[in-house]
Amino acid sequence: MPYLLPITAAALLILLALIIWFYVKTKTFKTQLQFLSEQNLEISNNNQLLNQEKIGCLQKIEQLKCKVEYQEQTIKDSEKIREESFSSAKAALFDLGKDLSKQLIEIHKMENNAARELAEKNIATASGKFNSEFERLITMVGALNKDIEQSKGTVDLIKQSLLSPIGAGLLAEITLENILKSSGLRPNLDFIMQYGLTTTDSGKLRPDALIFLPSGNLMVIDSKASKFLVDEQDNSGNLSKTMNYHLKSLANKDYAENILTNLNKKDQNFNNVITLMFLPTEQAVEKVIAADPEFLQKAWSCNIFPVGPAGLMNMLSFAKFQITDHRRSENYKVIIEEVRKLLSSIGTMADYSQKIGNNLHNMVTNYDKFAASFNRNFMSRVKNIHKLGIDSGNKAMPAALERYQIVSSKSEIIEVEAENPPQIEEKL
C-alpha cells in the first residue's frame, strides 16, 4: 500500500542509524579497551619498579636500623660518662659557687646602696624640675586663658563691626583697595581712590575708585556691602531690600554725568563711563543673586555691573593691557626720535672710525718708508764701519727692521632677504 512506503523507509533509516551508532560505539569501546590494556600494562611495569624500590628501601632501613642501634649504645655510654663528669664538676662548682655567692652578695649590697642614693638624687632633681615646669605650665595656662578671653572680645568686636553697616562698608573698601594695589596699575596715574567731587546742584559724591582707560573711557567703582552678607542666618528678604536700595542710590547718583562734567572742567576729556558695583566676596554675589534673581538684570538696565573680586580682577587685567598698549602707542614718537638720534650717532662714529683708519694707514706707510731707508742707507753704512774693525760691544746689531704694509679694500654689505619682510608704509 502507498502509505507503507514512507513508514518502511523511515524504519530502514532508523535501522541504518542504529547500525551506524552500534558500529561507532563498538569502535569506541575497542579503542577504549586497547587504551585500558596499554594503561594496565604500564601500571604493571610501574608496580614491578615500585616493588624493586620497596626491596631496596627495606634493605636501607635494615642498615639504618643497625646504625641507629649502634648510635644509641654510643649515646648511652657518653651519657654515663657525662653524668660522672657532671657529678664531679658539680661538687667543684658548688664549692666555687659558695665563695662567689658571698662575694656577689657583698657587691650587690654595695651596688644597691649606690643605686639607691643615685636614684634618690635623680628623683629629687626630677621632682624639682617637674615642679618648676608645672608651675611654669600653670602660669602659661593662666596667660593663655587671659589671651583667649581678650581674643574672644576682639573677635566679638570684629563680628559686631562687620555686622554693622559701617563695618561691612569698610570691609568692601579695604578689599577693593587691596585688589587695585595688587593689579599692577599705577596709583594716582591709572587709578584714584576715594575721588571726591561736587555735583552741579552742590551735592557731594565720593566714588571709591576711578580707573582711567584709553580713548576717553572711564571706569567708576563703588563698593557696596551689607551686614546681611556677613551674617550666617538666612536674611534673603532684608538682603534683597538693602542691595536694591544700594542699586537705586547708585543709579540716582548719576556718576557718569557728574564725573564727566567734573573731569572735563580739568581739561580731561572722557566720553564713555562704565560703573561697577563691587561686592567684597564671590559668596556675596551668589547671596545677592539667590536673594533676588532679577538683581543682575535690574543693574544691567541701569548700566551698572555688579562684580566680585574675581570679576574685578579680570576687568582690571584687561584694563591694564589696554593702558599699557595705549602708553606704548603714545611713546611711539619718542621711540622714533630716539632711533633717529641713534642713527645720527652711528654716522658720527663712522666718520671718526674713517679718520682713525686713515691715520693708521698714514702711520704704517710712513713707518714702512722709514724701515726701507733704515735698511738700505743706514744699515749699509753700519756694516761698512763694522768691516773696518769697530765693534759694537755686547750689543748685537740688528739685521734689518721689519716692514709692514696695509692692504685696504672696500667693505661689502651682505644683504639677506627675509622670508616674510614686514610691509612698511611711508606716511607723508
Curated annotation (Swiss-Prot):
Source species, domain of life: Bacteria
Key words of the record: Coiled coil, DNA recombination
GO BP annotations listed: DNA recombination
One Pfam family this sequence matches: RmuC
Stated role: Involved in DNA recombination.
Family that this chain belongs to: Belongs to the RmuC family.
Protein name per the record: DNA recombination protein RmuC homolog
Gene name of the encoded protein: rmuC
